[in-house]
Amino acid sequence: METVFIGFGSNVGDRVDFCDRAVTLLSLLPHSRLQGVSLLYETEPVRDQIDPEEGWFLNGVVQLETNITPRSLLSTLQEIERALDRDEDNRSGPRTIDLDILFYGEHVIKEPGLAIPHPRLHQRRFVLMPMNELDPLWVHPTLNQSVAQLLTAARDQSQVRLLFPQPSTRYGSRPACSSPPNA
């Protein structure tokens, strides 16, 4: 099984519910086991042209162990996005849910429509902060720096704040990163 980190975020509608539903669906993937879920962070949208009406995102990271191939996992994430009413034509604006493969083990993949590790994760505190909760010592396979080192070096100036209070959830009542069951 490979260790996989998936970033998730929502800034439309009931953001907590969309994030919770996405994590629940990820926890139910076949040939996979949920290892951890970060706390939720509230983050301002990151784009060149930000619409003042656009809401802040809730972001987090999920850690899975899986035997699903990277391409199949990407297809599954896109199916989950569609099931949660993601507008497929809107890749950079407001969205009910956004799911991204951040890391797939130590694999480096550059194919049309699939880039692993995520090409901008090292620049984004809204990904690095929750990832740092789950595994600060995880090493980026091409940059050869740990998540903790990447977070320290990130120049991202956007606001990222811990959501308070953290919601209760359906996925094992574990709103925060925690040890896997029976650990």
Mark where each language-model region is:
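Extreme N-terminal starter segment of soluble prokaryotic enzymes
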Residues: 1-6
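Short hydrophobic/aromatic beta-strand micro-patches
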Residues: 7, 63-65, 104
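A short secondary-structure junction motif
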Residues: 8-12, 46-48
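Residue-level signal for inorganic ion chemistry
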Residues: 11, 37, 130
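Short N-terminal binding/cap micro-motifs at the start of the first secondary-structure element
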Residues: 14-16
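Residues at alpha-helix caps and immediate loop-helix transition turns in enzyme cores, especially N-
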Residues: 18-19, 143
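Short, surface-exposed acidic-centric catalytic microdomains
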Residues: 21, 26-69
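Flexible, gly/pro- and Lys/Arg-enriched active-site loops
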Residues: 46-57, 68-74, 79-183
